[in-house]
Swiss-Prot record:
One of its GO terms (biological process) is tRNA modification. HAMAP family: TrhO. The active site is at residue 192. It comes from the Bacteria. The keyword tRNA processing applies. Gene3D superfamilies: 3.30.70.100, Rhodanese-like domain. The gene is trhO. It catalyses: uridine(34) in tRNA + AH2 + O2 = 5-hydroxyuridine(34) in tRNA + A + H2O. Keywords: Oxidoreductase, tRNA processing. Residues 134-232 form the Rhodanese domain. Its EC number is 1.14.-.-. This is tRNA uridine(34) hydroxylase. Belongs to the TrhO family. It comes from Prochlorococcus marinus (strain MIT 9303).
């Protein structure tokens, strides 16, 4: 797999975000666990890869050769055309360690029986997305969590205010069903960071009898790649689950930083507040933890800073 492009530089790390809903037997998962861990160690990769009977989900960071080696090993056991991959670049390593884990689900909704490889909504490519969401008959739904939505979203999107993806089915039954009934001609358009949550969310909706369900192919990250900022309907930055915290429309690290105490994204203004202590507390968690917790957080921050200076 050739992942070189014009941005390739000896000073940049390559970040690959990928997933595939591909049914695997246990023997394949066992082999992949061993092979991917070995490749990660060999190429000094960092990141996380989740494997389950329903497929694979991961984000890894490292050299172009290392990232290519791991992806090529994965593709040997994937069905061609069912691998969603996005590449970006960062001047610093985006992760602190490398993990390959066996999970019940590659994205956790907590419901058995869903199969996005067989039942899924209508894919909408990035260059067609604006037309869909500009239509007043479209119900635009953000399937991400509320702390992700807080730093960026598509204009006019509905925020289900979920804390985790497991909360989404309850919101569908308590809120979305009545919204659709009140708007009989409605089309549903859903989006998430890279597309994986929408695959499962649209599969769930269809299983529950919803129709005219669409989702953004490749998610927000693909939209950033393919739609110019001047034509974009996106507002803000896109939260990502690594040390970059958030990406701007150029797929470069944005202005947000992470509070390592509570995990919330912070603006420069948040970091300038008197209550902020790096790695220990922020405005979101200033009253949330005990003194013992603060001491532990401070020691962890000291160790992180010491490690980064090596």
């Amino acid at each position: 797999m050739n992942l070189q492009d014009d941005q390739t530089s000896a000073d940049l790390f390559q970040v690959a975000t990928f997933y595939s809903f591909t049914a695997w037997p246990e023997v394949t998962i066992t082999c992949l666990l061993q092979d991917l861990l070995s490749l990660g160690d060999e190429h000094q990769l960092m990141g996380t890869v989740l494997l389950a009977e329903e497929g694979v989900n991961g984000t890894i960071c490292g050299s172009v050769d290392g990232v290519s080696a791991l992806l090529e090993r994965l593709e040997r056991d994937l069905i061609e055309g069912l691998f969603e991959l996005k590449i970006s670049w960062t001047p610093e390593q985006a992760f602190r360690r490398f993990k390959v884990r066996r999970k019940a689900e590659i994205v956790t909704m907590g419901l058995a029986g869903l199969n996005p490889s067989k039942t899924v909504g209508t894919y909408v490519d990035a260059h067609e997305w604006n037309d869909l969401i500009d239509d007043p008959d479209t119900l635009l739904i953000d399937t991400r969590n509320d702390y992700e939505i807080a730093i960026g979203e598509f204009k006019g999107a509905i925020n289900p205010q979920t804390k985790c993806f497991r909360d989404f089915p309850a919101w569908v039954e308590q809120q979305l069903r009545s919204m659709v009934k009140a708007k009989t001609s409605a089309r549903i358009a859903m989006y998430c960071t890279g597309g994986i949550r929408c695959e499962k969310a649209t599969s769930y909706l269809i299983e529950k009898g919803f129709t005219n369900v669409h989702h953004l192919r490749g998610g927000i990250l693909r939209y950033f790649e393919e739609v110019s900022q001047s034509e974009s309907r996106w507002q803000g930055e896109c939260f990502v689950f690594d040390q970059r915290v958030a990406l701007n429309h150029q797929l470069s690290p944005g202005v947000y930083r992470l509070c390592h105490a509570c995990g919330m994204p912070l603006t420069p203004e948040d970091q300038a507040m008197n209550s902020y202590r790096t790695g220990v507390q922020c405005r979101h968690c200033v009253d949330q933890f005990s003194d013992t917790d603060r001491i532990r957080f401070a020691e962890r921050q000291r160790q992180m800073e010491h490690s980064s200076r090596k």
